[in-house]
């Protein structure tokens, strides 16, 4: 379900037998949570009249997933099924994470008449004006800006906006762990993924950054994991982190500017605020280095293929 949602952009549902089936979902649901994947988790529960009596393989399913979903709710009456289901789905979409609906087994066989609740879809939010202005100033004056694109770029449909930013600044674009789809790999400015089994070219390039725009990423530890003997995270760079979830800004790395907002909206806001000469400092030198670094890494990979 996680892979389907991430590859298609369509929200999916996961359901399993109560007890052992549900416990088998623990790690996959937490993975989807950290991947910002909106999912509907349906957990059948023991029937109301036997709940809490220690029936065969009964577990506390709400407590089990408490720290693994952005929202959870148990259906208290069959007549509220549509209402609760609608709310849980919307919470998953708004939180960009799994949300859980817990349904007692005796409700699965009831036939009732319900009024379908209206779907209220909230607009994704833009970044705060002060933070956007500061981010644009840093990027406009940067000598070696680097973009690190993550899941939020994919979820927010911000790939084109990321390309525009990169091309305006002639900045290399590194991708977060498991998010190679956040920037076209055939683009001249694409440096490849960081972190575990990542691109040495991406690591070498981001190590030179004086400003990093972490766009739509929580800066997953696996995305900043040292590789090939390179501790590449730029310790003296200004870090601009953009995430739809404010709790994840500054969670793993120190940030200079935190922007709570949708990656696409924020990218457009920054583009509008960049100075007319943004990216001009050492532009050609930077472009040449990107090309040389990528070429050297590709040659190394080619030699490995033939060993």
Language-model features, listed with the residues they occupy:
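Short internal beta-strands
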Residues: 41-43, 102, 170-177, 240-243
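Conserved thiamine diphosphate
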Residues: 10, 56-95, 208-209, 257, ...
């Amino acid at each position: 379900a996680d892979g389907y949602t991430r590859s298609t952009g369509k929200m999916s549902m996961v359901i399993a037998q109560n007890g052992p089936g549900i416990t088998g979902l623990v790690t996959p649901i937490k993975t989807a949570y950290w991947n910002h994947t909106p999912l509907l988790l349906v957990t059948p529960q023991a029937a109301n009249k036997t709940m809490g009596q220690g029936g065969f393989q009964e577990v506390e399913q709400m407590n089990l997933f408490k720290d693994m979903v952005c929202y959870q709710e148990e259906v208290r009456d069959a007549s509220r099924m549509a209402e609760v289901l609608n709310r849980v789905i919307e919470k998953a979409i708004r939180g960009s994470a799994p949300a859980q609906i817990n349904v007692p087994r005796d409700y699965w066989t009831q036939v009732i008449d319900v009024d379908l609740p209206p779907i209220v879809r909230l607009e994704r939010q833009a970044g705060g004006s002060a933070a956007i202005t500061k981010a644009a100033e840093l990027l406009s004056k940067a000598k070696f800006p680097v973009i690190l694109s993550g899941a939020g770029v994919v979820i927010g449909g911000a790939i084109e906006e990321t390309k525009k930013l990169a091309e305006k600044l002639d900045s290399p674009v590194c991708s977060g762990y498991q998010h190679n789809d956040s920037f076209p790999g055939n683009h001249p400015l694409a440096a490849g993924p960081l972190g575990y089994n990542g691109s040495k070219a991406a690591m070498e390039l981001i190590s030179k950054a004086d400003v990093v725009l972490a766009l739509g990423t929580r800066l997953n530890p696996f995305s900043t994991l040292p590789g090939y003997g390179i501790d590449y995270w730029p310790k003296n760079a200004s870090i601009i982190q953009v995430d739809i979830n404010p709790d994840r800004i500054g969670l793993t790395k120190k940030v200079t500017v935190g922007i709570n907002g949708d990656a696409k909206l924020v990218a457009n806001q920054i583009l509008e605020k960049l100075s007319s000469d943004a990216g001009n400092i050492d532009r050609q030198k930077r472009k040449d280095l990107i090309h040389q670094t990528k070429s050297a890494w590709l040659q190394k990979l080619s030699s490995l293929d033939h060993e």
